[in-house]
């Protein structure tokens, strides 16, 4: 389940100690919400690789995994099951005479929680189904799904329909105020955003990691709308919140007389009924509102849905859901926001930060949703999931609730539309896909352009996620528990991995000195590290490197950044400034830019090849002269000298 704490996870490796390192994750006693397990441990001295073992018993009599790994991160996607307990350990692979393996670092235990339970209808289990029609055409990866009912919950499946991750199981307090989580966005770096009733309403707009820790949330007493919330490219966060006004009831709607029977004027003029729309809100990292856009300041209440049945809902709910804004795309390059307003069958392009409406795309004037809409020939209706793809096209899910009236369809028809807006005035259709009649989706829905050119589509029609080629061939289909609460999904995303924060750092020449201290022994003119991206995503990284001791520097202080593709590695080299300095201590911090909670803070004791710890006069031997010099350093409080710090605890005292 979700954790209510908000924190940054920092791995602190004190590698200049006597200890040989630790197992990092899973931590001892962890209960995981996924079966693709990421194992991570600290680098071991003189290791050329590592042997990882996992067993179902603490004595390791029943090994389910026995594998060698070059780096300090290993992800297994084949050997683990829901609702089970495991034990794991790691040892070094050595390259020396008579020592193939080092000692076991230790043993940790972890368990895996249960998978999402099946839906039971009158005692009968309703199962989902998954069909692969063209495996060789599929985009590699997994499908992440955010679901509405029986309360907010999310899960990820593989191409066979097997669940590999979930956001936590709803056991009680189901509904919108439960502590469940519905994902509504996963970006290109693997950041998960969505809605949760945990500590309602403070986490109704939140970002989480794979372990469902709350990485960031609005912490706002005003609830965030569940349709879309995400971190935008300027580093801030954006979402919808309801805003209210009083407006008229239309005089020519099929519900007009019903309202009049209750005493309303319903004349299309008199302000007498509560309306609400969705304002766009931007928060900075300190949870402060730094920008907002109120639709009542930019749109006229003369524009409203008069054909889609929204006033029937208004009558029953006691307020009019005027806009039902459900998606936005923030484009920092052009400094605009594209917004989908479902109940107006309208997509707007808004200048940022002025808030001026550049254009509204929607229906012809006779449908009462605006007199100056562009691209009226498209005649889309009740759309979802507007987005701008890399080449500048707009891609969205056209639910088509009004397609019979607008397009002459024989039945309501859902379409995927990829269009290009020309000169902010008219549209060119780049690609269009008409879903089969049984997949018509009157609500929700999403579409994603995949790296291989396919489209991943979710439709509430039969609760299905499909993958479609550019030639409009369905090559994969997952159908939820049909006609059940569990089948009501909201959005789906195809992703390459469930561990977007996974990376490993290896220090060259990491060894042990004659006093059993862990050190890096420089053999040339540079200190070298290898970093490998194990996340499955292309990730940018940042780092800082510097010394933690006073006196003349052995290295320059450096900060920098780089980008790695999936499973790519890079070598970072830091040049030695002064070859006469024989030892120092350095701090090396590195983190994925979009997953800064995965910060690694590394500290090392550095020596050159000819440095003998304790040899204070540099004569190549340790004798009484060095002892006298050490005593004088302690008595006189002289400047820190790493060669005198025999136990590498950062201070020089009688223990040394």
Where is each model-derived feature located?
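Sec-dependent N-terminal signal peptides
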Residues: 4-17
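Alpha-helical segments with a strong preference for the paired helices of cellulosomal dockerin domains
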Residues: 616-643, 648-656
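Hydrophobic/tyrosine-rich beta-strand signature of extracellular beta-sandwich/beta-rich modules
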Residues: 86, 90, 588-590
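Surface-exposed, short loops/turns at beta-strand junctions within beta-sandwich domains
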Residues: 77-85, 577-582
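Pro/Thr/Ser/Gly-rich low-complexity, intrinsically disordered linker/stalk tracts
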Residues: 21-45, 82, 101-122
